[in-house]
Amino acid sequence: MILGIGIDSVDSSRFAQWHTFSRKQLERIFSAQEIDYCLAVPVNSAQRFAVRFAAREAFFKALGQSNNQHISFLTMCKNVKVINSSRGVPELQVDWSMFPALSHQSIQVFISLTHTDSVATAMVLLSAG
């Protein structure tokens, strides 16, 4: 059963200077692992930050359809991260304990990420069962 679906696109140019931000600033939104990945190739950092930000926005939208509990965007950001699986496929890792109304359910998270030089897009689907 589909619990929620979210999609978000962002202009990558908004993230052009994020590689100059302090780790403390970046850690308000991203995990240490994500920051390291985004900064590893400076020429790609804007697209990498942008698509991970879009993933959070898409998850936030999908979550809003299946959860009556109000959680701020920044709180949600600290409990969600994009990781690359051993096969190199992006996955959204969620700390479900922050979402008590949903933590008892077996929820699958499907994510698709894409970006060009100028636009980053993410789609998230939440499914129960």
Predicted region positions:
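Core catalytic alpha/beta fold that binds nucleotide/phospho-ligands
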Residues: M1-G129
